[in-house]
Amino acid sequence: GENYFIVRTKEELESLDFHGKTVALDIEVSGNIKTDPWATGEIIAISIYDGSAAYVISSEVAESHESAALMRKLLADDKITVVTWNGTFDIPYIVRRLGLDTKLHEDHDAMLMHYSLYNTAGEHGLEPVAQRFLGAPDWSGEIKKYTKGGGHYERIPRDLLYYYNGADVYYSYQLYLLFHEALENDPRSRAIYEQRMIYSAMLQEIQPNGIPVDLNKMSELRAKYEADREAALAVCREVTGLPKFNPNSPKQVKEAIASLGVEVPSTSEDILKQARYDNPEISPLVDAILAVRAATKVIDSYIDNTVKLVGE
């Protein structure tokens, strides 16, 4: 339509000028962002809405030098206000794929605006929020049959994908106008939003390049916590007299504490701590059980999981 343009050539890209405007920005990518290594999928559409028209940069030129130059100008020009919906995903992805400065980020995130105003809302996705506040239609309905089982937006016919991407920025822009006015009249929510934007900018700078991880130090920490766990496990088995006592077994823990004359309704941390407070005589066993659990959590949740992510 007259307010919807597909940008298919480098010349058309170079002709775009958004100086002095507020624009909404969104991307679509190939692959499955939930399972694929981060930013390995190509950007197959970039959409910009400037308050009067949507410009959808097609897959042929979305990752071109001209596209990179336009994105750099959008994000660096202080006379252009860039709005996203969950820019913590889009902006680092653009930065990584197009080779931009990691300190570039959007000016406003309408999703964080919504979260700051309505943090107890059950849904913060663009489409349901647009339907609630703007009476928007189900504009993604047609694409769902192509994306079953994962992302893979490359499966969507291009013209349909571009329409979907254009609708995303149109509604992001309209919601931005609505929430911006609401925040102007709500100082408390505005302060929360401004703080969240600071956190978002920090995360965006980190994501394209990651953070350094000292694998030698991680190995040292793992050895330390393994030793702590083994020492606590030895105490558990000494106190209970059971060489195969398993502190992760609720049944065994209940029976062991009962053998000391104390009944507990569950083996949750809070219950065990309360039982220990009420019955100091079980402290050696409870302390050891909790120490085993704590060391296991550090090893499994933090050390091992962090090491697994190195290089992704």
Residue ranges and their predicted role:
Residues F18-G20, E42, L75-K79, T102:
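Short, well-ordered loop/turn elements at secondary-structure boundaries
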Residues E12-L13, E63-H65, M113-Y115, V253:
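A short acidic, often aromatic-flanked loop/helix-cap motif at beta-alpha or helix-coil junctions
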Residues L13-S15, A45, S67-A76, I91:
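Short amphipathic alpha-helical segments and helix-helix/interface helices
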Residues I44, Y49-G51, G87-R155, L177-L178:
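Metal-dependent phosphoesterase core characteristic of DEDDh/y 3'-5' exonuclease domains
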Residues G1-S59, A121, F133, Y146-E312:
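Conserved "right-hand" nucleotidyltransferase catalytic core of DNA-directed polymerases
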Residues A24, K79-G87:
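Acidic beta-strand-to-loop metal/phosphate-binding motif
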Residues D50-V82:
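Nucleic-acid-processing active sites and adjacent nucleic-acid-binding tracks
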